[in-house]
């Protein structure tokens, strides 16, 4: 009898642990998230969850800025509760999510005890594609004469982009004492999947811009003060820093040659390897959307400051 009495609780604990592990497992992996506030437009975020020693760990890429680690996560009554940490107001932000099946998430973002935006997520696609055998001849995305094929986005009423002297220029000079944020970005009207991009840029001292691949992955242009290498010239923003010892060389023309196939990107700057077929885990801050399986435009960041100049923008795509 004693053996049976001892065995029953042990068996119950084992069953509960197994169920909890199964409940957690369906939430693990990378998720492309869309956040829909009560007013305003939906915007993208991204999340990755892993499990280590029975503990859920992870990271989140918010709407802007760099990714950060979550402060905790647990599965409660079949729901995933992700603690994102406090917002500026001090309220704790949590995501409460369910997984109804088919690799999707639904839920709500809570600020303290108050329900906020609704959440929807899909499993991030693998995007595992082989390198194309042949590419098309490079063609210009900017003719140097006008903005045909490009359109401002964001704060379009404060568009500073002009075509001047064969260059695509964000004419938004830095004013001492002002952040000069709020000008428009600009994107191509055409969308692309896999490609080879050539682009040249001249970023002044103190300038800040970015080249967004498929509108989702930022190749950093300029500097954010040198404190974080992954925020400096040539970084895949917040994911991969430039090579050790790389110089920003602001105020000079520099070229980028970018090959993006699936989720893997190679970046050369002035012919020097910066990123060799590295995996892009997910969108960076400032992405237009989180629809990673879809083609997307190029977009150039203009909502910071500095007279950023681009030229000689060409693209090749896989031959069909």
Regions found by a protein language model. Give the residues of each.
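Bacterial N-terminal signal peptides that target proteins for export
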Residues: 1-9
């Amino acid at each position: 009898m004693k053996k049976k009495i001892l065995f029953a609780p042990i068996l119950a604990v084992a069953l509960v642990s197994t169920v909890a592990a199964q409940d957690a497992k369906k939430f693990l992996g990378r998720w492309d998230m869309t956040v829909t506030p009560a007013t305003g437009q939906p915007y993208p975020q991204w999340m990755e969850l892993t499990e280590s020693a029975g503990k859920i760990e992870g990271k989140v890429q918010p709407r802007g800025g760099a990714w950060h680690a979550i402060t905790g996560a647990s599965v409660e009554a079949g729901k995933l509760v992700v603690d994102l940490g406090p917002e500026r107001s001090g309220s704790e932000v949590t995501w409460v999510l369910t997984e109804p099946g088919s690799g999707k998430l639904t839920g709500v973002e809570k600020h303290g005890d108050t329900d906020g935006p609704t959440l929807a997520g899909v499993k991030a696609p693998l995007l595992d594609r082989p390198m194309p055998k042949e590419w098309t001849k490079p063609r210009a995305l900017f003719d140097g004469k006008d903005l045909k094929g490009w359109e401002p986005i964001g704060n379009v009423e404060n568009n500073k982009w002009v075509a001047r002297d064969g260059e695509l220029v964000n004419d938004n000079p830095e004013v001492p004492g002002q952040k000069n944020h709020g000008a428009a970005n600009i994107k191509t009207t055409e969308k692309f999947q896999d490609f080879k991009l050539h682009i040249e840029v001249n970023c002044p001292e103190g300038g800040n811009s970015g080249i967004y691949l498929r509108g989702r992955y930022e190749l950093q242009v300029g500097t954010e003060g040198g404190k974080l290498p992954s925020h400096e010239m040539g970084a895949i923003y917040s994911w991969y820093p430039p090579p050790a010892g790389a110089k920003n060389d602001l105020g000079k023309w520099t070229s980028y040659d970018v090959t993006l196939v699936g989720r893997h990107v190679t970046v050369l700057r002035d012919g020097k390897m910066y990123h060799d077929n590295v995996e892009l885990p997910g969108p960076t801050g400032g992405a237009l959307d989180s629809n990673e399986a879809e083609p997307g435009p190029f977009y150039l960041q203009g909502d910071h400051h500095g007279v950023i100049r681009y030229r000689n923008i060409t693209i090749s795509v896989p031959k069909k």
